Amino acid sequence: MLPELRDLFVRDLEKLTLELEAYPDEASVWAVPDGVLNSGGTLALHLIGNLSQFVGADLGGVDFVRDRPAEFARRDVPRAELIAGVRDVSALVAGTLDRLDPAALDAPHPTQLPGFPEGMTTRFFLIHLYGHLNWHLGQVNYHRRLL
């Protein structure tokens, strides 16, 4: 299951990179039209923080301190910086999953979060994180086409 999850995360983070590259200009990455809560740039920052924390730090032991409020507050980060961040987190996720002992999938995830089952396994949470990535990837795609 780990190789499949790794490949899916890498594939869809590459799709996120392609979406960011497809915006017509820098300003549109950060545009928030009426009825839309988050820009494509905000969603990219959020996914970078989310995966850096829950995969890179929690499972891979990478030194990372997440600033979730900043993920939603920062604006006008250059598109090249966003793309570099997505590529970095893709490599981080791939490397972490490559090194993860398959037995860890059935162990409780190191971070237990409110609203999730008590004793949530790493397998459960990785599947959740992949769904979360895809939810926001779809939002970025819609946001880009809406503009």
Cite the ranges covered by each PLM segment.
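Short, contiguous alpha-helical
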Residues: 6-10, 14, 26-70, 111-147
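Surface-exposed helix-capping loop/turn segments at secondary-structure junctions
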Residues: 22-29, 96-107, 145-147
